[in-house]
Amino acid sequence: MAGQTPSQTVGPFFAYGLTPELYRYAYRSAVGDRLVQSGTEGERIRIEGRVLDGNGEPVPDAMIELWQANAHGRYNHPADDRTDNLLDPDFRGFARTGTGTGPECLFVFDTIRPGALGDGQAPHLNLIVLMRGLLSHLYTRIYFSDEAEANAADPVLARVPPDRRHTLIAQRDQGPGGVVFRLDIHMQGPNETVFFDV
């Protein structure tokens, strides 16, 4: 009798295969943690954070995928066919990294601040979290602490209970190389990050 293949938890080796440069393998991934090139338009920023388990311990083998709009608020994707927002040929809009090569288990993305999409959504980053023990990947977002007015008007963020919104808002800091936004992703516990059913 034919049936659906049963689901399994995500294993510990997927991040090594999909982010080989981070884990110092000889072959390289086509997708890394840098979304910017020398000609990319927009304000350069760095995103840093950790994935924390239910005990508050950093997860060393999680993988994060990020996709975002460019500085003009347009995605580099065929489904975004708006002509009022310009495409940036030097901005891919997608990146992937793991958490396990440094002592702090940080994920780091070098990118630009995304523009507003024009549909009321505040500038934000879309994330997918994959890690051992999950039956499926999880979707979340990162908003920016210095976009308070735009965040207050965002229709997606407005659906999140006010006492949970802080789990989606990265805090701005000035690092040695420029602007850094920091946000940890909590998988469980009282500070559990809001995940979306997409």
Name the predicted role of every residue range:
Residues M1-V198:
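Beta-strand-dominated extracellular/periplasmic modules and repeats
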